[in-house]
UniProtKB/Swiss-Prot annotation:
Is organized into three distinct structural domains with interconnecting topological connectivities. The two NIF3 domains at the N- and C-terminus of the protein have the same overall fold as canonical NIF3-like proteins. The middle region of the polypeptide (residues 126-236) bulges out between the two NIF3 domains and is structured as a classical PII-like fold. The two entries to the central hollow space are capped by the two PII-like domain trimers. The trimeric PII domain may play a ligand induced signaling role and probably regulates the function of the NIF3-like domains. Zn(2+) 1 binds at residues 64, 102, 329. This is GTP cyclohydrolase 1 type 2 homolog. GO terms for cellular component: cytoplasm. Belongs to the GTP cyclohydrolase I type 2/NIF3 family. Pfam families: DUF34_NIF3. Toroid-shaped homohexamer that has a central cavity of about 38 Angstroms diameter. It comes from the Bacteria. PANTHER family: GTP CYCLOHYDROLASE 1 TYPE 2 HOMOLOG, NGG1 INTERACTING FACTOR 3.
Amino acid sequence: MKIADLMTLLDHHVPFSTAESWDNVGLLIGDGDVEVTGVLTALDCTLEVVNEAIEKGYNTIISHHPLIFKGVTSLKANGYGLIIRKLIQHDINLIAMHTNLDVNPYGVNMMLAKAMGLKNISIINNQQDVYYKVQTYIPKDNVGPFKDKLSENGLAQEGNYEYCFFESEGRGQFKPVGEANPTIGQIDKIEDVDEVKIEFMIDAYQKSRAEQLIKQYHPYETPVFDFIEIKQTSLYGLGVMAEVDNQMTLEDFAADIKSKLNIPSVRFVGESNQKIKRIAIIGGSGIGYEYQAVQQGADVFVTGDIKHHDALDAKIHGVNLIDINHYSEYVMKEGLKTLLMNWFNIEKINIDVEASTINTDPFQYI
């Protein structure tokens, strides 16, 4: 399996297009033509993680957090430059799966909920998928070759189906004028043509490509076409809602997940004895969604990186919070390893996958 094949597999299961626009995901360092010798999953790509990959003989690291994020202005032999230089020197490919893994139904938040032993887990804050229904009108004799070209270029696909078109027949009218150069008809004469309306669906990212291909392969000098926007609730969403088996107090639940996640500290906001049943989770840094979580029925909102003023606001408004620290996302190392092994087994791919043993939490606790 080459890196390009791995990227295709990852994009199929955890689409990079679902990442936030500000994010930097995908193949950050590497060569698509290189064969994969092994995959190491990591929360962060630190120098220690790179050394671990080298020791194992693995040439691919998949990290959750992008190493190249804010922009690199130099590649000196220190700091981030040292890490990047070592990756390149040892021909190690680096792939980032950040917010696309956050919003995935099997991603980080699902992994956290399962690690906490919760049940009835479902995605919240679902994204809106934007599609377009494309319709254009073409002379009957040109329909076949036109559809062939669109299909060859990846349009009119629905899941595992290609060449997904709908046709309806009718008559078109037009009159070429001025400097027109008509394929059919004569200048200043109204022309009636047996035409077919062709309809097909595309993803939002294919819109400009579809317009280009229609203009390129349509026989008319000035083809008529429409893009009709359609929005649907996506399977992807930032966060999950889940439940404990039996009601617990806020303090007991905080202590329970501290133990299950094996993290050194947990903070919480709210009355210690308040009963907890439904839990909303956004791993990493999810502040800003706590009030939506309450509106959706959560008794407590679990996330990391909670600042003082956000915590105070929540306390004043009676919103329960639990801060499990950003590093709690480390569960994705084993979680992504399991996903990769399952996908590889389905495709009959024999490549070693391991979760990094390196603790990349920058904090020390006393």
